[in-house]
A protein has these predicted regions:
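A short, basic/flexible loop-to-alpha-helix module at the beginning of a structural domain
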Residues: 1-11
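Conserved redox-cofactor binding core of oxidoreductases
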Residues: 63-89, 95-105, 110, 120-125, ...
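A conserved FAD-binding loop/helix module that cradles the flavin
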Residues: 516-534
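A glycine-rich dinucleotide-binding beta-alpha-beta segment and adjacent secondary-structure elements
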Residues: 205-221, 243, 248-253, 428-516, ...
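Residue-level detector of alpha-helix initiation sites
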Residues: 16, 20-21, 186, 287, ...
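FAD cofactor-binding and catalytic pocket of flavoenzymes
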Residues: 30, 89-108, 112-115, 119, ...
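Glycine-rich loop(s) and the adjacent beta-strand/alpha-helix scaffold that form part
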Residues: 32, 36-61, 249-253, 261-332, ...
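N-terminal Rossmann-like FAD-binding beta1-loop-alpha1 element of flavoenzymes
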Residues: 14-39
Length: 543
């Protein structure tokens, strides 16, 4: 896609920082509106075979990543063990810090396409209940937008991406413009019937992407920007890609409320270059975008609220494996964003002594290994994962503490921990999961009692994913907040159209702009916000 020898210094109509789910869409939206766009990514532009690799070579790379310390934190996530570790950032080359007693597991994808290449592909809308906010340490923290503001963008994205799902009629999980849902497995249908009839809890088809079909989709999955928005953006002829360049900061005119471009650091040699543009769109992922803004403050960026970097959130989560009687022989369809199920509890929770809501995502009969590796070959294996809303708190924040990378770029210091509210939510999740498993005739068990794992069992000792406790912040890869949108400049960092209050020609459209976390998987809403903000910027440009 890229030709680094071409002139890129500008001036451009727009610079888009990051090429993942939001960055690819921002580039496409702006280019289709007539803007000349430079798309900058910190990582390389990989070919499909380089990105996905194959087994057993990927396994050897995982073991090397663990033993060398390059993937010490990211290897805690189960997704690491089914992907090419090349899609996970080298933690030695790209460090960050956190307090010793408050770990933060930050998963990064430093390549063109970003984390969209490892995204699970679940697409859920937020509701007005979510946008209305949640009770926090600062009172009720709400969004300055509602579902009506994003309706057209949600619908356009769902149609473009071709996601699956039912129309379930839930006020707290609005229906979308989806294709037919993917079918439950026989065990999932049995589970859903039991939970709905005996506990009164609704079990719905998950909403999202089906399995990647190379014959239909091409080499890249449609859930990735490489398989959807990026090739469309490049086909306009108005987008140029600058790979292997990490954006260090905004260029800010002294005493001005305008950014004139960005400073980008060549990852091959550390050389810095100034790239000029009328508009800058930050889509680098939540913490990367916050780090860019924090470094820009040192260059003169004004931020009137004093809230930049504060109120970082991730979804709090916990998981449970189980087995249940096999209701019949059959093939095992793959686990995907749409090939799975949800218990969309939201805030409708009996006996809850905490604020916020959660959902339970699960699958049964989609990932069993061969029978000789199963301790209970007559059963089918399932899992439930709870992910819940987190209360925004000023003490959970991203700052700069003087640590730098190999090229002297200041790296983020992440200080984030769960409060008693999140811990109470996790306890409720675990009770709810065990109730559901029991009424469905299943048995909740640790993974080691379900499978023989002779080669990898030593690696699983102490694994976060197998713990009954709340996983550390960052584990769920749904980090949001730190540059919240607000109705006025004293309560947030960006306005309702994602413009920095201190520099209105800079848009922050990724998860950093979220005032609250809600409980739903965030990517679809991030993309809807991106499309809305970029379309608004095009209207201002035309005027």
């Amino acid at each position: 896609m890229s030709n680094p020898s071409e002139q890129v210094d500008g001036p451009w109509d727009a610079i888009v920082v990051g090429s993942g789910a939001c960055g690819g869409l921002a580039a496409l939206t702006l280019a289709e509106g007539g803007a000349r766009v430079l798309l900058i990514d910190a990582g390389p532009d990989l070919k499909p075979q380089q990105a996905f690799g194959s087994e057993p070579a990927n396994l050897l790379r995982r073991l090397a990543g663990l033993s060398s310390g390059r993937h010490r934190r990211q290897a805690q996530h189960p997704g690491y063990w089914k992907a090419n570790p090349r899609l996970y950032a080298d933690e030695l080359l790209h460090p960050y810090t956190h307090p010793t007693d408050r770990p933060f597991l930050w998963t990064r994808g430093l390549q063109v396409g970003g984390r969209s290449l490892t995204w699970g592909g679940i697409t859920l809308r937020l509701s007005d209940e979510d946008f209305s906010g949640v009770e926090g340490g600062d009172g009720v923290i709400a969004w300055p937008i509602r579902t009506a503001d994003l309706e057209a963008d949600y619908a356009a994205l769902e149609r473009m991406l071709g996601v699956h799902g039912n129309r379930d009629g839930l006020a707290h999980l609005p229906d979308g413009e989806t294709c037919d849902p993917l079918p439950f497995t026989a065990a999932e249908r049995s589970f859903a019937d039991a939970v709905q009839s005996q506990l009164g809890l609704q079990v719905i088809h998950s909403r999202g992407f089906g399995p990647h079909q190379p014959q239909r989709d091409g080499a890249w999955p449609r859930s990735s920007s490489c398989g959807s928005t990026l090739p469309q953006a490049m086909a306009t002829g108005r987008v140029k890609l600058l790979a292997n360049h990490l954006v260090e900061s905004l260029l800010v005119e002294h005493g001005s409320a305008t950014a004139t471009g960005v400073v980008a650091v060549d990852q091959a040699n550390g050389n810095r270059r100034s790239v000029m543009a009328d508009l800058v769109v930050l889509c680098a992922s939540t913490i990367q975008s916050l780090a860019i803004l924090l470094r820009s403050q040192e260059q003169g960026l004004k931020e009137p609220s004093g809230r930049l970097g504060s109120r970082l959130m991730d979804h709090v989560s916990t998981s449970q494996f189980f087995c249940m009687p096999q209701p019949g022989a059959g093939s095992q369809p793959p686990l995907t964003g749409a090939g799975s199920f949800f218990l969309p509890c939201g805030r409708r929770l009996d006996g809850a002594d905490f604020s916020g809501g959660y959902g339970l995502w699960g699958g049964i009969g989609r990932f069993d290994p061969p029978s000789w590796l199963r301790r209970r070959p007559q059963s089918v294996t399932g899992f439930l994962i709870g992910h819940g809303e987190v209360i925004p708190q000023a003490c959970n924040r991203v700052t700069l503490n003087g640590a730098v990378d190999r090229w002297g770029v200041a790296v983020p210091h992440i200080d984030c921990q769960w409060s008693s509210n999140e811990l109470a939510m996790v306890a409720h999740m675990r009770q709810q999961m065990k109730r559901c498993i029991k009424v469905a005739g299943g048995e909740a068990l640790p993974l080691k009692e379900l499978f023989h794992l002779p080669l990898v069992e030593p690696l699983l000792q102490g694994a976060v994913a197998l713990s009954d406790a709340a996983s550390p912040p960052g584990y769920y890869i749904h980090e949001v907040g730190g540059a919240a949108m607000s109705a006025d400049p004293s309560h947030g960092v960006v306005d309702p159209y994602n413009r920095l209050w201190g520099a209105p020609n800079v848009l922050v459209v990724d998860g950093a702009c979220w005032p609250t976390s809600a409980w739903q998987s965030p990517t679809l809403t991030m993309m809807a916000i991106t499309r809305r903000a970029c379309r608004r910027a095009l209207k201002r440009r035309a005027a």
